[in-house]
């Protein structure tokens, strides 16, 4: 049905937090504001319920553990054709963190866990922060205690913060930890790659059979697969299968959805005295080894993760052609990218009498280049060492522009 606009958000019985602060907490149920143009003030029931929870979270972040919503109402104003929302809150008292003890930890010391928790005795109670430092569900690679264990093989670990004592305005906590056995990756499979060959994906996997389970490596693998550009990054789904705490093993099945990786560029316009046309083709999952396999043309040989680009740009006074090729795993065993390209451009002088290109007067440039880029391991594998070699050949044919003292000749350059 019709999404109604929100005329006003009112809060009742709030003395510890201002209306402005509480309105800021509700992200998707904003009241009408002529200044705000990027966020619509429309009422959506599901988002409204979520925003009510965010009001309580805002209180918990400021120490008000017992804050709750006593009642809320949504009324319709026929004259303004809009809704008015009233939220009645009970704030409660402000609390502070007391003693925080760790129980069940043998792998990490209390001091090490305290540094990760980042909460100290005497600080204002913050239930949202405490929950995130135990397990931040909004960030899979967050620096929290759960990830600390799971990045070190403890897939079956369980961490809970339990209130054990409340005295006046102080709350004591126990962080109860069940570490469990170390888990190892067992069988690793990939499904859904209808076009891309298995080896292109498996060489990017950081979760290898027999190695200690690591959530960090699992998250990194998802990111690496997404960066290939051949699959929908939002649809990458690692399924945990045959999880066996007794044997300490887990199978991972990566479910993928292929997406189009080729691109076509077609542009046209007027400039520099005439029409300029551009045609570009880019094939980002090419297979050079199948170029002579007629059965692989569907319509082109694809699936090996190589990139081929062709580009043509032309007008009355110039022409440019270029072809490039890159292989991200040169030799197939290590992440060493090989790249090569060739380009040729031809530019004609303008005949000022006829205002046309003089095809007898040209400046030609041919460029060849090759390069290697190796992924390093020190200081980490985000660093790349690259080197390249290029060759240019210049050819002047009756090209007298006044910039040179000559109009004919050739030159070569290596770099």
Residue spans for each PLM region:
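Interaction-mediating elements
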Residues: 1-228, 233, 242-249, 256, ...
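Gram-negative/organellar outer-membrane beta-barrel architecture
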Residues: 5-6, 19-20, 24-36, 41, ...
């Amino acid at each position: 049905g019709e999404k109604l606009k929100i005329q006003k958000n009112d809060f009742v019985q709030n003395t510890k937090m201002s209306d402005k602060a509480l309105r800021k907490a509700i992200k998707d149920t904003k009241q009408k504001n002529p200044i705000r143009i990027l966020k619509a003030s429309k009422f959506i029931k599901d988002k409204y319920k979520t925003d009510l929870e965010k009001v309580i979270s805002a209180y918990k972040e400021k120490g008000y553990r017992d804050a709750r919503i006593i009642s809320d109402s949504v009324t319709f104003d026929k004259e303004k054709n809009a809704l008015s929302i009233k939220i009645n809150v009970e704030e409660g008292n402000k609390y502070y963190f007391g003693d925080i003890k760790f129980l069940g930890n043998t792998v990490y010391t209390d001091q090490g866990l305290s540094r990760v928790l980042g909460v100290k005795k005497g600080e204002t109670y913050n239930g949202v922060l405490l929950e995130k430092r135990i397990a931040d569900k909004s960030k899979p690679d967050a620096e929290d205690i759960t990830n600390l264990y799971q990045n070190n093989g403890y897939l079956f670990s369980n961490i809970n913060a339990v209130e054990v004592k409340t005295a006046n305005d102080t709350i004591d906590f126990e962080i109860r930890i069940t570490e469990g056995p170390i888990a190892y990756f067992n069988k690793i499979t990939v499904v859904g790659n209808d076009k891309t060959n298995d080896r292109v994906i498996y060489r990017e996997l950081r979760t290898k059979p027999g190695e200690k389970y690591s959530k960090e490596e699992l998250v990194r693998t998802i990111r690496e697969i997404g960066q290939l550009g051949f699959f929908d990054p939002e649809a990458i789904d690692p399924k945990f299968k045959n999880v066996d705490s007794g044997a300490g093993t887990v199978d991972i099945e990566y479910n993928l959805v292929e997406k189009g990786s080729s691109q076509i560029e077609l542009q046209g316009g007027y400039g520099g005295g005439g029409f300029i046309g551009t045609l570009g083709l880019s094939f980002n999952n090419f297979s050079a080894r199948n170029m002579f396999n007629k059965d692989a043309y569907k319509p082109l040989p694809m699936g090996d993760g190589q990139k081929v680009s062709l580009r043509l740009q032309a007008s009355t006074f110039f022409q440019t052609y270029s072809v490039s090729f890159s292989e991200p795993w040169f030799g197939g065993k290590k992440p060493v990218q090989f790249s090569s390209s060739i380009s040729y451009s031809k530019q004609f002088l303008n005949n000022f009498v006829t205002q046309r290109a003089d095809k007898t007067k040209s400046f030609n440039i041919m460029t060849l280049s090759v390069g290697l880029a190796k992924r390093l391991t020190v200081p980490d594998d985000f660093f790349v060492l690259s080197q390249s070699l290029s060759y240019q050949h210049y050819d002047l044919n009756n090209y007298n522009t006044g910039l040179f003292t000559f109009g004919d000749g050739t030159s070569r350059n290596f770099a």
